Amino acid sequence: MALVVFLTGVPGVGKSTVVGLVAEKMKLDSLTVGGMTSGDLRSGSARVGFEIRNLMTNEVGVLAHVNQATGPKIGKYRVNGEDLDKVGAEAISSAVKDADLIVIDEVGPMELTSARFKDAVQAALGCGKPVLGTVH
């Protein structure tokens, strides 16, 4: 059975930083790292949304934004389901097939609005490969 590790904690504690450092170390050890990360979108010092990045292709999409017109509302943000599926869920699905380590940063209320994302996470957890992620 493969190792599955999810980090949790309050916002800003360093979950994503730890995952990023481990992923970089694995790349230095010649492992293929795939999956997705998320990060802040800022306008000046104000957070206006979140981006989502495919670690294998470096494709970036908008996970959620204050100016997103449609989609599920989580706090002051609306989730961009199209980018969540196209970038996030696809990144995880590709990692299940092609990576040595699957990164899922993060699983939270925004990501869980997508059935395709949830299916991709389930596939990752059941594929027998190591998974490293964060939980909101």
Segments predicted by a language model, with ranges:
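Loop/turn-to-beta-strand initiation segments
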Residues: 32, 98-102, 127-134
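Hydrophobic positions on the alpha1 helix immediately C-terminal to the Walker A/P-loop
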Residues: 18, 22
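Phosphate-binding/switch loop-helix module in NTP-utilizing enzymes
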Residues: 70-122
